[in-house]
Structure formats: structure tokens, C-alpha cells
């Protein structure tokens, strides 16, 4: 009976998670792609005006777009079709290092805010295939949650240069963490680091969400969480962010 009970519980959890996914995807999953390919890119190429994007870089292959959620949240997106973390294009050497480009674009937050925002308050995140609402790759550039900031500060010396479980996880979910230098982040995509260094990740990249956070010693911590429906983890690394930017009012 115990085994039957566990099986039924697992079925209920999976069905519930699928229901959440259906609700999340019930809108237009191509809305961001249409903005990039049908508005921002043509306007830049034809009129040298990036609107409605904040910036369009056709040769570099990306745009920066002000998200409607939160006063300071921006998105970095490719100027061509890449769905998300599951795309094999992200593991090709010729593909831009979108996380590094997103980090370089963090200045838009300060410009919008009207004051310099410290790097320690900024985070980058991309959600998994199930954890996202849009089918065009987009990296969230936004504030970090104050409690996540505090936890990562406390774990500073315990985060290795190898992918290892983060003690206690984050937001009730298991996370892997890896420390990198600024030079490493600039030269090598976090997508490649995950695919090449975590067993079996390459074959299941769509299950993963990734985040990048600056540490007080000027290193960066890469965070990765894998979808697990039994624990109701849809792998949405955006959960470590706070789009209201409460961390700025506490400084």
C-alpha cells in the first residue's frame, strides 16, 4: 500500500505541475520574438532607432529590452531564433556569450534608476523550458532578492570552482553552484560550462535554469537548478530575483 500511495502522490504532483505549466504557457509564447524580429531589429536597420528596445546590436547579435515587470528589469535577447536553454546553438563556439553581454548591459538599470546600482544588487537569470513563459531566449537582468544575497554572502568561502550542491539550496530548491573569475565569465559561456562539466547536462539542457551573481570578492557565482516535478521545481532561476528591487531601499 505504501508504494501505491507514493505512486499516486507522484502522479498528483506531476499533474499539478503540468497544470501550472499549461496556465503559464496559455498566452502568446512568441510575443518577445515578435517584438525583437518584427519591431526592434527592423527599426534599427531601417531608421537607426532601436525602439521599442533600449538597444539593438545587429552585428553582435543581441538586443536589450525593458521588461514591463518591475521598474528596473531588462531582458537581453538574441536577434535571431533561439528558443531557450535547450537550443544546441548555445553550445556552439560561434554563438555570442549572452550571459557576459547581459552583464555588460546592467548599466541600463542604473540609468533607469537615476543612481549607480552596486554590482552586488544585480543578478542575471534564465529559466528552463518548463519554467519560462516565452519561447525566445531571454536573460533577466534584475535585482537579487535580499535573502538570496545574504545567503550567497554567507556561503562565499564554501563555493568551489567546481559545480557542487549549494548548501541548503535556494528558495526551497536544489541548486548547483560554481565560482568563476570575471575573465572566465567573459571568455566562456555558462551554458558551455554547465554542459561540459555537469554529468548528463549536455543531453538535457532544457531541464536547467541558470543564474549569475557577483560576489564581494569580485568573483561570480554560477547557479544552476534542474527541473524536478516531484519537488514542484520547474527550474525557474528567476525566483532568486526581486523585480521590485527592495535591496536598493535597504542600502
UniProtKB/Swiss-Prot annotation:
Pathway named in the protein's UniProt entry: Phospholipid metabolism; CDP-diacylglycerol degradation; phosphatidate from CDP-diacylglycerol: step 1/1
Species this protein is from: Salmonella enteritidis PT4 (strain P125109)
EC number from the UniProt entry: 3.6.1.26
Transmembrane segments: 5-25
Topology within the bilayer: Single-pass membrane protein
Name used for this protein in its record: CDP-diacylglycerol pyrophosphatase
SUPFAM superfamilies: HIT-like
Alphabetical GO biological process terms: CDP-diacylglycerol catabolic process; phospholipid biosynthetic process
Substrates-to-products reaction catalysed: a CDP-1,2-diacyl-sn-glycerol + H2O = a 1,2-diacyl-sn-glycero-3-phosphate + CMP + 2 H(+)
Pfam families referenced in this protein's UniProt entry, alphabetically: CDH
Family affiliation: Belongs to the Cdh family.
Gene Ontology cellular component list: plasma membrane
HAMAP family xref list: Cdh
Chief localization: membrane
Enzyme class: hydrolase
Compartmental location: Cell inner membrane
Keywords associated with the record: Cell inner membrane, Cell membrane, Hydrolase, Lipid biosynthesis, Lipid metabolism, Membrane, Phospholipid biosynthesis, Phospholipid metabolism, Transmembrane, Transmembrane helix
Coiled-coil parts of chain: none
One of the record's GO molecular function terms: CDP-diacylglycerol diphosphatase activity
Gene3D superfamilies, A to Z: HIT family - CDH-like (3.30.428.30)
